[in-house]
Amino acid sequence: MTKSHEAVTHWYPASVAAKRPTPWWYWGRAVYVSRRDYWKITKYFLAVGIPLGAIGVMFRLPLAFWASVALAEIGLLLLAYSLFGLYRMYGHPGARYVRRLVELGSLKGKVTVADLHIGTYRHAFLLSDVLPEATIQTVDCWNVEGESPEEAVQDVRDLEAPPTSNPRIVAYKADHFTLPLPDASCDAVCFGFGTHEIPTGGAREKLFSEANRILRPGGKVLLFEHGWDAHNYVIFGPVIHHVTKRQDWDKFLRERFDDVKYARSTQAVDLFAGTRR
């Protein structure tokens, strides 16, 4: 069993099961769950900038004063770029990389897609938009012992309820990474943001084995994730260091699937598609 989670009161509004959240809501939630990282980075800037400014004023050192001003400007510029980057990933432009991912996997028509995630149903909605004839079986796969290494995961889970607004989207819950779906019942499985939070050394391997089990012969595996690179570092800050590297995802997928393809979206999202053996 997972460790019990104490109820937390959030000042960001939670979703309603019977109503699809807007792209603005998803962007706002991404900003909200990143608040700890923003504050941590802000403290570093303040710890350097305030003393510099004080030294410049007290000792009449223009260089120190203007260095503090420049530091503040850099901080504001990085914040603005981060907020814009999050919007491109989680706001309205996010549909573009999901569409490109579906094209990379050559999916179309009346397919059945398993959306495997850790508590956000955003991916299911986007898949239903890009594949208007598809049935989306969205499965909450989060079942990790103890606390998440990233507090944002629990925030994400607290704020979004399983959807009931779209008849083509059916929500399920995995049991210790065992999927409640029959063998060879899906044309594709999709893993999205947050998959890197599922630990290696057992849990991740089991979940991808389950994905293979529910895929029909020739079925597709799709994956979109944050990369470990300079672009994502500017958007997310040092927290990006704990995500899985592109090379590691590529190796992991090639060990389990055939014809693995890779593409990079303009929103700094890594895209992978492969075929069941």
Q: What would you call each of these model-derived segments?
A:
Residues 28-47, 57-106:
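Class I SAM-dependent methyltransferase Rossmann-like catalytic core
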Residues 204-217:
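A short glycine-rich, Lys/Arg-flanked "PGG" loop and its adjoining helix->strand segment in the class I
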Residues 258-277:
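Core SAM-dependent methyltransferase catalytic element
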Residues 218-225:
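Conserved beta-strand signature within the Rossmann-like core of class I S-adenosyl-L-methionine
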Residues 120-178:
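Class I SAM-dependent methyltransferase SAM/SAH-binding core
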Residues 177-189:
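A short acidic, Gly/Pro-enriched loop at the edge of an enzyme's catalytic core
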Residues 109-120:
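Conserved class I S-adenosyl-L-methionine
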Residues 240-257, 262:
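Short alpha-helix
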